[in-house]
Amino acid sequence: MTDLKASSLRALKLMDLTTLNDDDTDEKVIALCHQAKTPVGNTAAICIYPRFIPIARKTLKEQGTPEIRIATVTNFPHGNDDIEIALAETRAAIAYGADEVDVVFPYRALMAGNEQVGFDLVKACKEACAAANVMLKVIIETGELKDEALIRKASEISIKAGADFIKTSTGKVAVNATPESARIMMEVIRDMGVEKTVGFKPAGGVRTAEDAQKYLAIADELFGADWADARHYRFGASSLLASLLKALGHGDGKSASSY
């Protein structure tokens, strides 16, 4: 197996196969569930809006892949600093049956100098998730923070508040995941000594098998080749799947989605 094939198979099994579009329908989510079951293995999860969780759960069960996890988003994509609304959305997502919640950190508040509200928001959402055995990923929106010190600070605050994962981006702004921001965030995980309990998720802009290989290489360099498993590493993507399957000898590499 070539290096690209090996990394593509790894990446496929770490994907949160995503559709977060305004025109999403039951039919599109059902199709996403079908795509998550591939000839070379399943993606780790799908990521969808909360209202589609019941139809996704039913579809995954019917197609014989109930182990594919269902992730959803809250405080999304705006990252407002209203803790009560973020918490209410997170509780609603849990009630719908989410296995994982990706909440947007109030990054604009941090840019304005307020570190406390981000901590409090993540902590409140974590408490709700922990009570239901739901994993919490925190989206810090690196492409808006831009500054390395702010990316580090948002990562640190999220981890201290209980994040199970830190995630780069919503996929809804001009700049999403970059290898540079990925390295900064994973260095925070390393420097805080939390690599056993905290994972990393690049999202938005990871589109090709070669892209995924680059991101995995950073993780391997920092933590060794065994760290990036589904508990510690995910790719938030949609069009990436077609490229990975093509690298693995399945399909033509074309995809209808751009996330």
Swiss-Prot record:
InterPro entries for the chain: Aldolase_TIM (IPR013785), DeoC (IPR011343), DeoC/FbaB/LacD_aldolase (IPR002915), DeoC_typeII (IPR023649)
Catalytic activity: 2-deoxy-D-ribose 5-phosphate = D-glyceraldehyde 3-phosphate + acetaldehyde
Record's subcellular location: Cytoplasm
Membrane-traversing stretches: none
Gene3D superfamilies for this protein: Aldolase class I
Disulfide bonds: none
Cellular component terms (Gene Ontology): cytoplasm
GO BP annotations listed: 2-deoxyribose 1-phosphate catabolic process; carbohydrate catabolic process; deoxyribonucleotide catabolic process
Name of one Pfam family that matches: DeoC
CDD domains in UniProt: DeoC
Domain of life: Bacteria
SMART domains found in the cross-reference section: DeoC
EC number(s) per entry: 4.1.2.4
Sorted UniProt keywords: Cytoplasm, Lyase, Schiff base
Pathway assigned to this chain's UniProt record: Carbohydrate degradation; 2-deoxy-D-ribose 1-phosphate degradation; D-glyceraldehyde 3-phosphate and acetaldehyde from 2-deoxy-alpha-D-ribose 1-phosphate: step 2/2
Function as written in the Swiss-Prot or TrEMBL entry: Catalyzes a reversible aldol reaction between acetaldehyde and D-glyceraldehyde 3-phosphate to generate 2-deoxy-D-ribose 5-phosphate.
Stated name of the protein: Deoxyribose-phosphate aldolase
